[in-house]
Amino acid sequence: MVNIYDNANQLAKDLQETEQFKDLKKSLENLKNNPESLDLYQRMDKLQQQILAAQNSGQPLSEEAQKEYQKINEEVRNNDELKDMITKEQALFQMINDVQQAMTKPIGDLYDDLKAK
């Protein structure tokens, strides 16, 4: 019998050996070593948490939060460390998405006979 959890744990270890993971790790180290970029990241993260909380509670985003969001987005577009981190993060998540699609394909295949032809 297959222990799928062992495979998942091995996949997590293998993930850490990919170029995409290593590139993101290096990018995050560069970001941490730049106080200005780190501060911007932390402000962006805090605002994203506030936006998510507002959305989850059905509250509209305040005008002040909208302006802050626009301001931070502009700063991010002009920050090389954050732009690099976002690019590396997107590459890693694209790979993870590809793996997830491969893993879930057999589930979709189970339903193929049920689909209208």
Swiss-Prot record:
It comes from the Bacteria. InterPro entries: Com_YlbF (IPR010368), YheA/YmcA-like_dom_sf (IPR023378). Belongs to the UPF0342 family. This is UPF0342 protein LJ_1677. It comes from Lactobacillus johnsonii (strain CNCM I-12250 / La1 / NCC 533).
